[in-house]
Amino acid sequence: MAERGTIIEGKYEVLKLIGKGGMSKVYLAMDKNLNKQWAIKEIERKAYDKNNEVVVASAMAEANMMKKLDYPSLPRIVDIIEKENVIYVVMDYIEGETLSSVLSKEGAQPQEVVIEWAKELCRVLDYLHTQNPPIIYRDMKPANIML
């Protein structure tokens, strides 16, 4: 597990943990060469866990597919770093709050705002569905939508 101050691949300095899921952790990091912030997803390899092999293979397939995408509302993947015990996926850092967080703090939102969010989500899904082959996003939920 990376900690604050850890340098990844000689250039990405971990600033803080910004997210945690079932299969990964996400850190905010600074590229020391470009003076730019990135989000770095850390996926741990667990040699003793057969299920982890599936998780790692799935995460790598997802990262390799996503690095080919180019759409303003989707984070770009700019680097994939494979180490013996861990994989780091370096992607755009998107500032803001999740839809889940906004709804928890503020409750229901004005109809006009929700319609704009829905339109943008539809545009993103349309972009994904028009890829060859089509990409089906199966993890659409408020916690995965940044505003």
Task: Give residue spans per PLM region.
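Protein kinase glycine-rich loop
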Residues: 15-21, 26
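Glycine-rich ATP phosphate-binding loop
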Residues: 28, 36-45
